[in-house]
Amino acid sequence: MDLVLLEKALLGLFAAAVLAVAVAKLTGKRYRLPPGPAGAPVVGNWLQVGDDLNHRNLMSLAKRFGDIFLLRMGVRNLVVVSTPELAKEVLHTQGVEFGSRTRNVVFDIFTGKGQDMVFTVYGDHWRKMRRIMTVPFFTNKVVAQNRVGWEEEARLVVEDVRKDPRAAAEGVVIRRRLQLMMYNDMFRIMFDTRFESEQDPLFNKLKALNAERSRLSQSFEYNYGDFIPVLRPFLRGYLNRCHDLKTRRMKVFEDNFVQERKKVMAQTGEIRCAMDHILEAERKGEINHDNVLYIVENINVAAIETTLWSIEWGIAELVNHPAIQSKLREEMDSVLGAGVPVTEPDLERLPYLQAIVKETLRLRMAIPLLVPHMNLNDGKLAGYDIPAESKILVNAWFLANDPKRWVRPDEFRPERFLEEEKTVEAHGNDFRFVPFGVGRRSCPGIILALPIIGITLGRLVQNFQLLPPPGQDKIDTTEKPGQFSNQIAKHATIVCKPLEA
């Protein structure tokens, strides 16, 4: 470490602490802030609570400090809400006031300081991007046009697993094949293209670039430079890696996909996929070319991996609950007929399959804190003052796993959505269960995720008995929480024993 730089940073910290205290006493606005642990000057609560602000740690803090509490993370205020009533206030009632997204040094790089849709502030740019993305990505028409492709990709997964001699014996890490399926599901929508196999060089390049992007943005390593700007020089190497990765990813998107669609459109004049719609919006001057690339960035980050995590969690729970797996198979055989593959239109006739999807999203929520919200101006919440540009976290996982609000929430029990919770849906009609958020900044990808998860789990259970590897009673479902995610820590080996056709 550069000792001169460290000395300057420490002196800067001391000076900032003295100045902050003096300014606060002389001119500071008096706020009635939410409760929370007392913090130290400059660093606030950072050294007390550490970097790992995952959903379970925040649940523990809520039990100590209440339904709404404040953490001071350096110069940033972080407000956490943990009840359905407060979630409704943030996401719906005051959806405009708390409808922006927080900014940090890493996401500013990956989104061009908010030129995308998912991570931009609430305003005209967000409204424009949401409108432009909705028609080609997030409508019932899109589902109707693409569902045959999703069903085909699920069929190919089943075929490939059947062909693999390891699958029925020692088992396979089925996630790897499902990852190819998810890329194909989304790249069919985006670019009217697909990858032929897991060995496809372009697929592997994309997969590696997206994985590195997730690692860099999900890591807690950069928090100190984000929380305490005077320490940001120590992040120089980290931020340079982010810039380099962004450049390489954007070049792959541009050279291999966007330009290819431009060539096809020039030849045919037809609009066949989402990117054609997006490029038409660029041609009309509604967005610029950077916006086009950031839309591709959003879909790669916000649609592919998150849905894959949910499928992986669903498989893990079905393996560990063979009676539930058998009950699902019986439902499909009874409703569809033995050997009849489940399709997207069938899902509404399969309530137990729908309940399994919802129970997976409840217990193993992929984005347990949702995407953080922010208020651009001073606001009020539960009678407390919320200073402008506070980061607002809704602990959606805790809302869906609070024993005060759910019967035996730590159990994987799909029957709850057919019995005491039969009116609860994933789109947020009950603020105890908001896996995709609610309101203006909710995730529009719900319209794609639910059928893809349902088709995939249904096809696998129709064709295989899903089992743990030899010598194991269950597979490990330890969580690996990130800043914005909840993944399974170890990608499990699954024995896929073919069923009689």
Swiss-Prot record:
Enzyme class, UniProt record, top EC level: oxidoreductase
InterPro entries xrefs: Cyt_P450 (IPR001128), Cyt_P450_CS (IPR017972), Cyt_P450_E_grp-I (IPR002401), Cyt_P450_sf (IPR036396)
Binding site for (E)-cinnamate: R213, S214, R215, L216, S217, Q218, A302
Cofactor annotation: heme
Residues passing through the membrane, by range: 3-23
Keyword Glycoprotein: no
Metabolic or biological pathway, per its Swiss-Prot or TrEMBL entry: Phenylpropanoid metabolism; trans-4-coumarate biosynthesis; trans-4-coumarate from trans-cinnamate: step 1/1
Molecular functions (GO terms): heme binding; iron ion binding; trans-cinnamate 4-monooxygenase activity
UniProt cross-references to Pfam families, sorted A to Z: p450
EC nos: 1.14.14.91
Binding locations of heme: C443
Membrane topology (UniProt): Single-pass membrane protein
Location of this chain's protein in the cell: Membrane
SUPFAM superfamilies, sorted: Cytochrome P450
GO annotation, cellular component aspect: membrane
Catalysed reactions, as listed in the record: (E)-cinnamate + reduced [NADPH--hemoprotein reductase] + O2 = (E)-4-coumarate + oxidized [NADPH--hemoprotein reductase] + H2O + H(+)
One GO term of the biological process aspect: lignin metabolic process
Cross-referenced PANTHER family: TRANS-CINNAMATE 4-MONOOXYGENASE
Cited function: Catalyzes the first oxidative step of the phenylpropanoid pathway in higher plants by transforming trans-cinnamate into p-coumarate. The compounds formed by this pathway are essential components for lignification, pollination, and defense against ultraviolet light, predators and pathogens. Can also use 2-naphthoic acid as substrate.
Family, similarity comment: Belongs to the cytochrome P450 family.
Protein name: Trans-cinnamate 4-monooxygenase
Classification lineage: Eukaryota, Viridiplantae, Streptophyta, Embryophyta, Tracheophyta
